[in-house]
Structure formats: C-alpha cells, structure tokens
C-alpha cells in the first residue's frame, strides 16, 4: 500500500486527535514509505493516544496545533513546513462537525435552522478546509504523485439526497465538495502532479456518528482502523484522471 507515492514522503493529517484521523496517523506511521507524519489537532497535547504514538515513533511524528476555525493556526503549520523545506506528499483533512452538545444538532425541519449553528458547521466543514487548500496545495511535493484529500460525506451529495434534513451538515459538505472540485481544476494548471479528491468514509464508530448508530446494520458500522486502511487503499489507487472526484471508502465514485 502507498506504493504509488515516492519514497520517502511526509503526510499531514488535520483533525488527528481521535476517530478516523487518529487511526490514519497510526496507519501511516506503520508504512515504511512515510518518513514523517504531521498530526494536527486543536489540543494534541491532551490526546493520550497521540502522545503514545509520539513516544513509539519518536522522530517520525510531529504534533502541531491547528484549529480550523482559527486561520492563523493553519498558516503557521504550513509556514513551518515551508521554512523547513518540507513538501508534503499527502495532506488529509479529516476534521468535521455534525453535532456539539445542545448548541449544534442536525436539523430535522426548517424551523430548526439557526444562524450561529450554521456558521459553526460551515466554519469547520467548509471554510477551514478551504484555507487548508490555500496554504497546503502550493506547498505540496512536486516529485511524483501527491494527494490532497478531505473527508466529505455521502449526505453531501446533492444527487443522492432523498431524505432531506441535516441542512447544515449536508450543505457544508456539498460546499466542501465544490471547493475540492474547483481546486482540482486549478491544480491541473499549476500543480499538475497533485491529485485533489473528496472521500466518504462510510458510517464509522466515532463520536461524530455515535448518536445516530441505532439503525445502522452491524456490518455497515466500521471501526476507525478499518476505515483508515480502506481510505489509504483508495488514495493509493488514485491517479490524475481521478482528480476532482468524490469516492467512497470502497473506491466507488459518488455522484455530486
């Protein structure tokens, strides 16, 4: 796996303190092609799991503070890599927001729409990733294959929307998809080796999906570790013809 990437390369994971992001950090560190992993989170020092990985893979794991709602933190990490002469071969934006206590919950009807909640969900799911594209895409490796991928969601597909509801989450992921698609077009002109893609991880047993798992069949609820490995397989299979695409965890394309 990851044999399509030049060896060695640096990977950046944004949103790495738990769930799929944490599993991706662990999976990447197990691969010999990966020289360095930059794990970004709002409070990486408070993640026992990241600290354990840091002890185990000392020298190969860099922990950095990034809050997608705080643009200077995104610029600081990208600037630090640039100053060190490091060009990432893989950038993964995994952070996402569906619910947060009682202040942010998925809407079931129009009357549930709230400006503050909408702004918060869009800030994490679309605006933050847009700034990650701004700062990281020009920084990425020019040697061989490089990939910028972000976790979207099937519910962000306009063509696949048959149930309605979840206004903020659906529309913010649709916005993310458009941002990635648009960035892929610019990348073809400016950074021809960089592939840009949206990925759907499937329903994963994480804090994000926990309140909504009751009706999910057991064989459709995946562990973060399974999803991380599957996503890396999908990423490994991507080529320039796939740039600007939207793909599920099993590699199948998803309609916009």
Residues covered by each model-derived region:
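Conserved N-terminal Rossmann-fold NAD(P)-binding element of oxidoreductases
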Residues: 11-17
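N-terminal Rossmann NAD(P)H-binding glycine-rich loop of SDR-like oxidoreductase domains
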Residues: 17-27
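Conserved glycine-rich Rossmann-like NAD(P)H-binding loop of the short-chain dehydrogenase/reductase
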Residues: 29-49
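Rossmann-fold cofactor-recognition segment
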Residues: 54-72
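A glycine-rich helix->loop->beta "capping" turn
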Residues: 58-62, 80-95, 99
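Conserved Rossmann-fold cofactor-binding substructure of NAD(P)-dependent oxidoreductases
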Residues: 67-86
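Catalytic loop of short-chain dehydrogenase/reductase
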Residues: 97-127, 141-190
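C-terminal helical subdomain
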Residues: 198, 206, 210-256
């Amino acid at each position: 796996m990851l044999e399509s990437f030049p060896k060695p390369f640096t990977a950046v994971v944004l949103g790495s303190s738990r769930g799929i992001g944490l599993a991706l950090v662990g999976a990447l560190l197990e691969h010999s092609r990966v020289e360095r992993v930059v794990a970004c989170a709002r409070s990486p020092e408070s993640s026992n799991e990241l600290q354990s990985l840091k002890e185990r893979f000392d020298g190969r794991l860099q922990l950095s503070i990034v809050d997608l709602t705080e643009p200077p933190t995104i610029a600081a990490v990208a600037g630090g890599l640039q100053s060190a002469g490091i060009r990432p071969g893989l950038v993964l934006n995994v952070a996402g927001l569906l619910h947060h206590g009682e202040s942010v919950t998925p809407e079931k009807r129009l009357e549930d729409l709230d400006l503050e909640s909408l702004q918060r969900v869009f800030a994490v799911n679309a605006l933050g990733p847009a700034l990650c594209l701004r700062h990281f895409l020009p920084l990425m490796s020019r040697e061989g294959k490089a990939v910028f991928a972000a976790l979207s969601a099937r519910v962000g597909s306009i063509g696949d929307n048959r149930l309605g509801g979840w206004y903020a989450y659906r529309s913010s992921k649709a916005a993310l998809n458009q941002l990635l698609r648009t960035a892929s077009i610019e990348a073809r002109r400016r950074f021809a080796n960089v592939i840009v893609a949206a990925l759907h991880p499937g329903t994963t047993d994480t804090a994000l999906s926990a309140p909504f798992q009751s009706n999910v069949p057991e064989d459709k609820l995946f562990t973060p570790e399974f999803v991380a490995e599957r996503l890396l397989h999908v990423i490994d299979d991507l080529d320039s013809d796939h740039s600007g695409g939207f793909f599920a965890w099993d590699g199948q394309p998803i309609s916009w």
